[in-house]
Amino acid sequence: MPKGSGKVLSQNKKANHDYFIEETYETGIVLQGTEIKSIRAGRVNMKDSFAKIERGEVFLHNMHISPYEQGNRYNHDPLRTRKLLMHRKEINKLIGLTKEKGYSLVPLKLYLKNGFAKVLIGLGKGKKTYDKREDLKRKDAKREIERAFRDRQKGF
């Protein structure tokens, strides 16, 4: 199964708008019992989340997993820091890459693969405002071309 495949539960659409994604890595995530139940229900927000390397381990910050509705007083903290599981070689490579100016680790999607929750993180370089404008112009032009092609196929 290729990276990023499986049942997608949440996507960080803002990441592709704000960053040039250069590489992606599939990571496992350490969760508590009520967290996985809430994730399976699709109650996850990855909008402002980011990954950070601390003490040689990768952690995911600001990913909001809503408390499980049927949970009791032992429910989890929605914004707690969660550990990501990666191979040591990959972590060492990321340490070197993220020390460069402008690079950061951004979670792209959360999905289930063989019953396990996985997070696809990307090594991204921040976009400037004019880069974002160029992307929007490119998307609009592509949309116009497709619309014209579709109209031509219909027989106009």
Swiss-Prot record:
Hydrolase found in the keyword field: no
GO molecular function annotation: RNA binding
Cellular component GO terms, alphabetical: cytosol
Keywords from the named record: Cytoplasm, RNA-binding
Domain of life: Bacteria
Leader peptide range in chain numbering: none
Keyword Glycoprotein: no
Subcellular location(s) per record: Cytoplasm
UniProt-listed HAMAP family: SmpB (MF_00023)
Protein name in UniProt: SsrA-binding protein
Upper classification of the organism: Bacteria, Bacillati, Bacillota, Bacilli, Bacillales
